[in-house]
């Protein structure tokens, strides 16, 4: 089945099966179809697409909501107070499909179809108050929170609400809210008549790699059940996007995953550029690719060192941090920052490469291969490391897709899925590189895949060095690039346009667009909605870490606590990416 045939065939099968309940296909600028469904077939349609159709859609990449109450540009869309959106992916078809449901605040659950829908529905309940007809706990906000933050009626800034006063009564209520009763979660306290020990692992434990709490039920050292508790790092990033200009939100992207640098900026900008119809110049595209691969290496070096450290090898992390410092010196010279560069712009990058960039990059490329060889001897060939990781925390491709796992965690199972190859963006189709794969899907393979990915990133960076084109680094487009100063001095209309762009911000056409990339942790996706203004009406941020943590209760029962620590390290997440 060709790519051109893949989606029409799926849409026809869906319409044949559900008839008029497939209400309309929304006209968008997306690279995939967007369908509206009746609530009566919401669950059944998802089951059909996941289990019954040929070449199914096994991956629920995302599920989120939109408060439509203040939106003005909705031509051709059904009336809706809160719209529920699901984003499905078929690996066989290499195609996506988005389904939408118009709701009055109530929606059927699909958690019985896609296991990973549980956390996404909890988030939609938490942020929008959606009722899924089942018990739904808050997930990002504390249980004492009043209101639903992503509703348009909820305040966006602290200055819009009365001053906070911590009374004794409120303090006691907040303290009680931190106590979690396993009975209320449906978790057993007994095993074979013996009482389990309930352990709070985190939120301030070094092996949780951030403010993450995992409630554990232990029989001795064996993990019987695990319940992750997230949200401690939640900063309201999606709400912030509604209050910033389109350009002004770029620095916030860096903070979604503070180890990813410009990688976190790219999907947001791809979405805005798609909506605006902006073509990025070739030189800017290649600069973007080079910097993304640099930050991929920076992240993987940190993972590599802490992964070894969490199973008892203390030396590698110090050597790897030394090499990260070399990389960060180059990134600082190019972007002006190490970890939060805010360097990409709508239509290109902030500035051209500095003098001498090529010598710095070449020195790094000559240095790193031998270092990676040394790390392989220190870590991957270590009998102790292999004893702690081979066969531990293993899962197969079907399990990975069921729980929304992408990136190295999916490729470690042998699944060849990398958007840089399958759906090239920013010019990745020009580069020659391989996609490292594992076989067993265990901790060792997840480590091996990331180690090999660094070698491939070095190959990509070298090709950037040797083939960097000449030309501008920003599109000549009125929505992104200020007019020439000479024109502003002669033409009052040009001066006015520049003033409005600089003061009010870019006015993005009304519509919807999605940007997807193969991030260092997996699928990173921004879905934006513009209502024809200078700010986003809705920005949905799909991060890989959120999906990956939800898998913990499925994988860790039967492990020891020490193996749990190793498994957590092998996921490679940061809590800012989870909580946003």
From Swiss-Prot:
SUPFAM superfamilies: HydB/Nqo4-like, Nqo5-like
Region span, NADH dehydrogenase I subunit D: 195-580
Location(s) in or outside the cell: Cell inner membrane
Membrane topology: Peripheral membrane protein
Enzyme Commission code(s) on record: 7.1.1.-
Listed Pfam families: Complex1_30kDa, Complex1_49kDa
InterPro entries given in the database record: NADH_DH_suCD (IPR023062), NADH_Q_OxRdtase_suD (IPR001135), NADH_quin_OxRdtase_su_C/D-like (IPR037232), NADH_UbQ_OxRdtase_30kDa_su (IPR001268), NADH_UbQ_OxRdtase_49kDa_CS (IPR014029), NDH1_su_D/H (IPR022885), NiFe-Hase_large (IPR029014)
Gene Ontology MF: a single term: NAD binding
Signal peptide stretch: none
Keywords: Cell inner membrane, Cell membrane, Membrane, Multifunctional enzyme, NAD, Quinone, Translocase, Transport, Ubiquinone
GO CC annotation terms, alphabetical: NADH dehydrogenase complex; plasma membrane
The keyword Translocase is annotated on this UniProt entry: yes
Family label: In the N-terminal section; belongs to the complex I 30 kDa subunit family. In the C-terminal section; belongs to the complex I 49 kDa subunit family.
Subunit architecture: NDH-1 is composed of 13 different subunits. Subunits NuoB, CD, E, F, and G constitute the peripheral sector of the complex.
Described purpose of this protein according to its UniProt entry: NDH-1 shuttles electrons from NADH, via FMN and iron-sulfur (Fe-S) centers, to quinones in the respiratory chain. The immediate electron acceptor for the enzyme in this species is believed to be ubiquinone. Couples the redox reaction to proton translocation (for every two electrons transferred, four hydrogen ions are translocated across the cytoplasmic membrane), and thus conserves the redox energy in a proton gradient.
NCBIfam families, per database record: NuoD, PRK06075.1, PRK11742.1
Protein name stated in the entry: NADH-quinone oxidoreductase subunit C/D
Protein's organism: Cereibacter sphaeroides (strain ATCC 17023 / DSM 158 / JCM 6121 / CCUG 31486 / LMG 2827 / NBRC 12203 / NCIMB 8253 / ATH 2.4.1.)
């Amino acid at each position: 089945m060709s790519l051109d045939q893949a989606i029409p065939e799926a849409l026809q099968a869906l319409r044949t099966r559900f008839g008029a309940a497939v209400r309309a296909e929304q006209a968008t600028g997306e690279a995939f179809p967007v369908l509206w469904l009746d609530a009566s077939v919401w669950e059944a349609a998802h089951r059909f697409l996941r289990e019954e159709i040929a070449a199914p859609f096994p991956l629920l990449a995302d599920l989120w909501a939109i408060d439509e109450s203040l939106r003005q540009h909705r031509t051709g869309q059904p009336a809706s107070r809160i719209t529920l959106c699901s984003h499905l992916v078929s690996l066989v078809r290499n195609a996506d499909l988005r389904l939408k449901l118009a709701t009055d605040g109530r929606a059927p659950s699909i958690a019985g179809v896609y296991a990973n829908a549980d956390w996404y529905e909890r988030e939609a309940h938490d942020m929008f108050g959606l009722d899924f007809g089942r018990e739904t706990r808050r997930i990002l906000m504390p249980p004492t929170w009043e209101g639903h933050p992503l509703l348009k009626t909820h305040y966006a800034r602290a200055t819009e609400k009365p001053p906070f006063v911590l009374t004794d009564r409120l303090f006691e209520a907040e303290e009680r809210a931190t106590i979690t009763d396993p009975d209320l979660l449906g978790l057993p306290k007994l095993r074979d008549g013996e009482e389990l020990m309930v352990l709070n692992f985190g939120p301030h434990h070094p092996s949780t790699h951030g403010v993450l709490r995992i409630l554990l039920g232990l029989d001795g050292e064996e993990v019987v059940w695990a319940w992750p508790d997230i949200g401690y790092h939640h900063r309201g990033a999606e709400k912030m996007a509604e209050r910033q200009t389109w350009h002004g939100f770029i620095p916030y992207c860096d903070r979604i995953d503070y180890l990813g640098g410009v990688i976190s900026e790219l999907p947001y900008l791809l979405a805005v550029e798609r909506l605006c119809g902006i073509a990025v110049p070739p030189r800017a595209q290649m600069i973007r690719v080079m910097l993304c691969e640099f930050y991929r290496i920076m992240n993987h070096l940190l993972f590599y060192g802490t992964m070894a450290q969490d199973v008892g090898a203390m030396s590698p992390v110090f050597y790897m941090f030394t090499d990260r410092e070399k990389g960060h010196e180059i990134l600082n010279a190019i972007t002006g920052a190490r970890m939060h560069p805010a360097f990409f712009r709508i239509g290109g990058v902030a500035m051209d490469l500095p003098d001498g960039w090529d010598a710095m990059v070449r020195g790094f490329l000559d240095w790193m291969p031998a270092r990676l060889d040394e790390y392989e001897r220190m870590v991957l060939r270590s009998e102790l490391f292999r004893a702690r990781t081979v066969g531990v925390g293993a899962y197969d491709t079907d399990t990975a897709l069921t729980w929304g796992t992408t990136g190295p965690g999916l490729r470690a199972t042998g699944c060849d899925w990398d958007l840089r190859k399958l759906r090239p963006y920013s010019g990745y189709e020009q580069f020659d590189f391989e996609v490292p794969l594992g076989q067993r899907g265990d901790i060792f393979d997840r480590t091996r895949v990331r180690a090999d990915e660094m070698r491939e990133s070095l190959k990509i960076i070298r090709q950037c060095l040797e083939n960097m084109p000449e030309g501008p680094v920003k599109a000549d487009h009125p929505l992104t690039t200020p007019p020439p100063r000479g024109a502003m001095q002669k033409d009052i209309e040009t001066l006015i346009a520049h003033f409005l762009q600089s003061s009010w911000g870019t006015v993005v056409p009304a519509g919807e667009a999605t940007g997807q990339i193969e991030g260092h942790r997996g699928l990173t996706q921004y879905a934006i909605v513009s209502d024809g203004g200078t700010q986003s009406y809705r920005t949905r941020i799909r991060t890989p870490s959120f999906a990956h943590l939800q898998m913990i209760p499925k994988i860790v029962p039967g492990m020891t606590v020490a193996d749990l620590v190793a498994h957590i390290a092998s996921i490679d997440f940061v809590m800012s990416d989870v909580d946003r």
